[in-house]
Amino acid sequence: DIMKRANSIFRGCITLALKDYRPILNQQIKQRKEESKKRESETFIIQPSYSYTEDYEALEINKCILDKLYLRKQYNGKENETKFYNYLEQQESIEWWYKNGDQGKDYLSIKYFKSQEKTEDSFYPDWIIKFKDGTIGVFDTKAGITATSNETVDKAKALHERIDYLNSFNRSEIRYVGGIVVMEGEQWFYNDSIGYSYMNGKLSEDWKSMKTLFLK
């Protein structure tokens, strides 16, 4: 078989062709990823109404963009999220905020790569915030072990990349901010770094006070 010979002229041609094609393939993959990001960035719209089951309770909240805030009656992390939306309610520089859902096409989702499983998945950041100056914030609140998990590291990277992309994608009139949010010493901090890390009681310089976003 002439293809099995080490000095085969056909093997050399095929190898050369593959090498020449590799940059083209990489460019096509990059382009498809950019187009996918663009579609994801353009399609999310807050719906005028949502359906909820009996597992949810309705709360009267001033700055929530919906007429009422609907939360599950019981779930892990509810205490932390309740503290956070009460904190948002106190901020004069916020026009409105939205509590995102955790599944389904009607809610904002971001694709991320699960580094341990080597698979792709989607997550739903908890909060979308509209500031009075037009800035849009996308934040995900964490507490305890969820703040230190490898899954949160992966999500933080994806959220950083999405915010970075939105700010570079012909959106000069809109500024985007976002990151992972934790409470430390009765204060809220966020991390928008691509190299996310968290250690309880020892926040690195990548953690910024949420107050800096509201002093406008």
State where each predicted segment sits.
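Electrostatic, structured charged patches in enzyme active sites and in nucleic-acid/phosphate-binding
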Residues: 1-216
